[in-house]
């Protein structure tokens, strides 16, 4: 039977689809600048892995109203390019979109983004490490461990190395590829919605040298073969989980978890605080730069013994636990119940008095607080979340964001506050993403 899923697969996989969306003639274009995603732009064509000053020959396809270019040949290289090609997959997988650009120029372009958005001339704090800096990678499985092509949710690049995580992770990736081949385990097909293996998630404690493996699959009663893989990597890991996700969405979070090996949690240490992290919990992905992030948040917040602080989108308590001993009270609000449980555990193991509430920010209780830390996801604050903050009416807001575009949008909506200072950081080297911390104070009526 020719179901709608088979039709979609035919559409995506067929020559018809490729030529219907691809302009058949290659075009030569000059790259003038970047778009918000970090793609090079020239002649209104958006080109991954192209940088200002490049002259490139591209094949063009349409994605909605946008024209996307795929580099066929670099005719003249941008002066911003680097000769340090540190990974075999550079220019193919979407993990390091700016990986072919010199790091100092990456910082300069990120600085320009902040300056154009906010009018602040602030140097970006560089990442202490530019490779092997991430503490988590979520690798989709498509026959082999893979990463995705930029802008293509259905396009996979099989990998044998990844310079974002660690050398040990590269060994694990290759062992998992051998494991897949040995047992002929089918991978999940995001179009047909068939198969089994979905994601290999590797998490690391950069300061504790611990490592957690979280293998996410479609539903199945048993996964006995997994013990064979564990036997081959057990000297490299401290924890292994098998997780099941029955939902058809392409998300690397498990609905059911089975603990197979080692510790139940991954530990990470930021400054003097130890954090326990569960498989589905969020944690800042660059532990080295998280140290600087925490210091900036504390500097902007200026915690004192009379302060009551609300930490919105508090996760496992990264900021709350760092300031708890310096304020009268800190309350974290977090929608993910698993993260709230971890935050409570982290408070306990560090002998810290802090309160955590499982709730969407929009539905959280109104708490009298004079200071707020807010660190929302990339999508930023909803209108209801902004209304909640305005009801609290704090004197000080410290807004931490991994997306300065939505941060700018939200600040424009917040009534009665003005920007006092900001500090951008490079949490994500070799990508166009920017972390930005903004200090806001309540405006006086005479201002």
UniProtKB/Swiss-Prot annotation:
User: CDD domains attached here?
Assistant: AdoMet_MTases (cd02440)
> GO molecular-function annotation terms?
4 iron, 4 sulfur cluster binding; metal ion binding; RNA methyltransferase activity
Per UniProt, S-adenosyl-L-methionine binds at 284, 313, 334, 375
| Pfam families for the chain | tRNA_U5-meth_tr
* Gene Ontology biological process terms from the UniProt entry: methylation; RNA processing
Record-annotated disulphide pairs: none
Q: Which SUPFAM superfamilies match?
A: S-adenosyl-L-methionine-dependent methyltransferases (SSF53335)
What EC identifiers does the entry list?
2.1.1.-
What keywords would UniProt list here?
Answer: 4Fe-4S, Iron, Iron-sulfur, Metal-binding, Methyltransferase, S-adenosyl-L-methionine, Transferase
| Superkingdom in the source lineage | Archaea
Q: Which Gene3D superfamilies match?
A: 2.40.50.1070, Nucleic acid-binding proteins, Vaccinia Virus protein VP39
UniProt entry tagged with the keyword Lipoprotein: no
InterPro entries under this entry? Answer: MeTrfase_TrmA_AS (IPR030390), NA-bd_OB-fold (IPR012340), SAM-dependent_MTases_sf (IPR029063), U5_MeTrfase_fam (IPR010280)
Binding positions for [4Fe-4S] cluster? 87, 93, 96, 162
Q: Active site annotated at which positions?
A: 402 (nucleophile)
Family classification: Belongs to the class I-like SAM-binding methyltransferase superfamily. RNA M5U methyltransferase family.
The family database entries (NCBIfam families) matched by this protein are listed as: rumA
Q: Which PANTHER family does the record match to this protein?
A: RNA M5U METHYLTRANSFERASE, TRNA (URACIL(54)-C(5))-METHYLTRANSFERASE
Give the protein name, as stated in the record.
Answer: Uncharacterized RNA methyltransferase NEQ053
Question: Which species is listed as the source?
Answer: Nanoarchaeum equitans (strain Kin4-M)
């Amino acid at each position: 039977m020719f179901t709608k899923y088979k039709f979609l697969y035919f559409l995506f996989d067929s020559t018809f689809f490729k030529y219907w969306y691809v302009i058949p003639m290659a075009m030569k274009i000059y790259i003038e600048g970047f778009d918000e995603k970090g793609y090079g732009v020239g002649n209104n064509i958006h080109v991954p892995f192209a940088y200002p000053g490049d002259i490139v020959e591209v094949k063009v396809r349409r994605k909605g109203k946008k024209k996307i270019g795929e580099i066929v040949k670099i005719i003249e290289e941008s002066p911003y390019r680097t000769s340090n090609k540190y990974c075999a997959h550079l220019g193919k997988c979407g993990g390091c979109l700016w990986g072919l650009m010199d790091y100092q120029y990456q910082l300069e372009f990120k600085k320009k983004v902040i300056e154009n958005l906010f009018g602040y001339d602030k140097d970006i704090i560089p990442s202490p490490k530019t490779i092997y800096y991430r503490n988590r990678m979520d690798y989709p499985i498509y026959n082999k461990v893979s990463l995705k092509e930029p802008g293509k949710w259905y396009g996979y690049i099989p990998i044998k190395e990844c310079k974002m995580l660690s050398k040990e992770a590269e060994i694990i990736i290759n062992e998992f590829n051998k494991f897949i081949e040995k047992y002929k385990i089918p991978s999940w097909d995001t179009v047909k919605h068939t198969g089994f293996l979905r994601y290999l998630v590797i998490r690391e404690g950069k300061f504790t040298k611990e490592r957690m493996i979280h293998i996410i699959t479609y539903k199945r009663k048993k996964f006995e073969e997994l013990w064979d893989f564990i036997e081959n990597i057990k000297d490299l890991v401290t924890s292994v989980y098998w997780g099941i996700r029955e939902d058809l969405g392409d998300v690397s979070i498990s609905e059911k978890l089975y603990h197979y090996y080692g510790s139940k949690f991954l530990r990470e240490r930021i400054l003097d605080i130890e954090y326990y992290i569960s498989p589905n919990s969020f944690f800042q992905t660059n532990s080295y730069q998280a140290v600087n992030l925490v210091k900036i948040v504390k500097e902007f917040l200026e915690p004192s013994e009379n302060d009551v602080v609300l930490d919105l989108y508090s996760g496992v308590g990264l900021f709350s636990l760092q300031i708890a001993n310096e304020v009268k009270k800190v309350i974290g609000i977090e929608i993910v119940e698993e993260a709230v449980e971890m935050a409570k555990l982290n408070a306990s193991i560090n002998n810290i008095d802090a309160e955590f509430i499982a709730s969407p920010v929009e539905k959280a209780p109104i708490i009298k607080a004079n200071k707020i830390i807010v660190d929302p996801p990339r999508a930023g604050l909803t209108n209801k979340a902004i209304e909640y903050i305005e009801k609290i009416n704090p004197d000080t807001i410290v807004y931490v964001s991994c997306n300065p575009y939505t941060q700018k949008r939200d600040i424009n909506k917040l009534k009665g506050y003005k920007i006092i200072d900001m500090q951008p950081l490079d949490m994500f080297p070799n990508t166009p993403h920017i972390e930005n911390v903004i200090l806001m104070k309540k405006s006086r009526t005479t201002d």
